[in-house]
Amino acid sequence: MSDDTTQIEPAMAQETSPRANTRKVFVKTYGCQMNVYDSQRMADSLAAEGYVATDTPDDADLVLLNTCHIREKASEKLYSALGRLRKMRDARAADGKELTIGVAGCVAQAEGQEILRRAPNVDLVIGPQTYHRLPNALARVRGGEKVVETDYAIEDKFEHLPAPRREETRKRGVSAFLTVQEGCDKFCTFCVVPYTRGSEVSRSVKQIVAEAERLADSGVRELTLLGQNVNAWHGEGEDGREWGLGELLFRLARIPGIARLRYTTSHPRDMDDSLIAAHRDLRQLMPYLHLPVQSGSDRILKAMNRRHKADEYLRLIERIRNVRPDMALSGDFIVGFPGETDQDFEDTMQLVRDVNYAQAYSFKYSPRPGTPGADLDDHVEEAVKDERLQRLQALLSAQQYAFQDSMIGRKMDVLLEKPGREAGQMVGRSPWLLPVIIDDNKDRVGDIIHVKIVSTGTNSLIAQKLA
């Protein structure tokens, strides 16, 4: 799951006729797709309390920062934002107005009370497993408390979250995220997820199907199933048997209106036979797979506690491509992990050449407090990390552009997602996740049209509609 992008995600769709004194909320989302989903669900719970969204903090009564803790500077980003909000809050106070400030997400979970110590202007700190308690926490804030809600909940948060209103969901678009699994039990030595998101938990089939049906009823055509380790999902199926992610995908594909399915992020250890069979047999499952490996060196993979070897990963890729020859792969890589030698890095470069990725994310290793990796010796010099990252990214970029160029002349179905920048343009999504720009005046958002790719743009494809 990509995790280094800061974005502002509107918390919810604006009600058509908000009440004059309705409270407004602004949510800023940092990081991964699951944080985007969490922001939307927090907004759904606030909508039930009478909040409406605003796309700027300037007129918000409540500002929530939904944070990511994967990368080294996550906390610094948070405190910089809180400093700006403190000035805004002081200006409001001078005019006799109030501003409530909340911190949510994985930095909230990791730092808890420390956030209140460093930023006394914060009113609320709430973790990713407790945001279903947000309305109650805000009521306590209005009563004068400083609230920290980061204890892992005994109750199932998804049972306590209100269903999103149909019109709000419709305004979010024809593609939607749906969290089916949270947490991770793998304990990779570089990763904070087990400490901020907790142990692996799978939502029930009943919950997932009900939410997917609501999304489809609101016009969603494409679902992306989310989880920190999404292919570890398991649960009792409607037939009484234990299901894995493959069986769940087959069930969701039966929902009327759902034309496309994706999932992210996966661990190589949990790619089982039923999931590979789904890639072979399920036409709604798109031929794009994000399957992080992190390194091509067995020695470094062992130090990372990845629980697989490089050749096992390559054999898995071969199995997947044998059943789905048009499968495009993306991945994650860390360079400069403690003890990484020149040969270890060259092993990574060779694995990248062997796989030939359509896209990949790559980062320099940065020690995360509280992880085993932070206690390792033999750290790689920053200059060496920089040089290795530059070389790796050059190779990955060349592969990405080659993949895009390979699309020229191909015919494919494209899901139209939004109007383009130019009059008459539409922007859609290819099966391989690339944006596709089409000059089209007749079709609507949500339609799936057949096109031919005629050229490429920067990280996009240019297409002509076929009759």
Swiss-Prot record:
Binding residues for [4Fe-4S] cluster 2: 184, 188, 191
Cleavable signal peptide: none
Compartments (UniProt record): Cytoplasm
Subunit structure: Monomer.
Species whose genome carries this gene: Brucella abortus (strain 2308)
InterPro entries (UniProt xref): Elp3/MiaA/NifB-like_rSAM (IPR006638), Methylthiotransferase (IPR005839), Methylthiotransferase_CS (IPR020612), Methylthiotransferase_N (IPR013848), Methylthiotransferase_N_sf (IPR038135), MiaB_methiolase (IPR006463), rSAM (IPR007197), rSAM_horseshoe (IPR023404)
Function: Catalyzes the methylthiolation of N6-(dimethylallyl)adenosine (i(6)A), leading to the formation of 2-methylthio-N6-(dimethylallyl)adenosine (ms(2)i(6)A) at position 37 in tRNAs that read codons beginning with uridine.
Official protein name in the record: tRNA-2-methylthio-N(6)-dimethylallyladenosine synthase
UniProt superkingdom: Bacteria
